[in-house]
Amino acid sequence: MNFSDIGRVGAIEALYEGTPYKAFDKYGAALESGSQAVTRCKLMLEGTDFNLVYFPLKHLGYKAVTIGVGQIYAALAHPDAMDITIGVSAKLDYPQIKELWEGMVVAAKEHGLKHLGLDLVPSRNGLSIALATSGHADRLQVARRPKPQSKDLICVSGPLGAAYLGFSLLEQGAADYEKNRTAPDLDRYKMIVGAYLKPEIEADALTKMEDLGIVPSAAYLADRGLADVLKQLVRDTGLGAKVYADKIPFEGNTFELGKKLDIDPVSAAFNGGEDYRLVFTIPILKMEDFRHNLQTFDIIGHLAQNDVGAVLVTPEGVEMPVHSQGWKDDADEEE
């Protein structure tokens, strides 16, 4: 089956067959009393955000939707609906888009989306994926959100740095294949490669916290590295932030691969990006409840007085200022 046989409308209708979603659904559910709307947008471009030489289309679809719902979770809200526009390049036809869509549907079902909209448009510059995600936040939970304080705990939802190492391994493998026609052996590093190709976010983490009466004082999605999150945290709270190098979680053989690629895993965690982990700050009085009931999260640091800034604390106790691409350094700001 090809686009030339069924056309755009027929293709969209065919893609929805066997899914719990409806094609051309004019979704507009009213918010429940006591809720407020949250919306986020994301654009993903071939050659910038993904490389189809090695990226399985089903994984790409799954990852795209995961990123969209992750943005909603990072707003301390629950995802409800997503509208997707796929820009289809000339080298792709219906079977490839079907594979991409299948991954999107899997992720949408995992996160309980009530609506998944789709449009297909032609693209002259490679595959593109535009996401518009909406969700809701309980007004009572918003009102209960505490003001960030020094000593609030900084918590992350899973290992960091693996995505960048996985990306680097795939890029190296693609280059080697182009040069020598030898396929890379990725079996030893499946978890690390998977962290880049198919990141996962725990769908019920926010609900668990709400049920336990744990209300984060701040929340972020680590998409550009932990350093970027800490910079945002310091800016938004007016406080300092300390993260301890020996508390950062890593996948099992991250350091082995880091040595092979000559990449420091701590640097990958801070500046690599693409991990798509949730980062919360939690009042220190909730530490025991949090540790006991949300064991997939790791406590990696805490907020501090504002003169501290954003720092990484080494195992020897040395505090190193954190820098992130896209942010002006303190020295630059003083000029």
Explain the meaning of each model-derived region.
Residues 1-335:
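Helix-biased detector of long, well-ordered alpha-helical tracts
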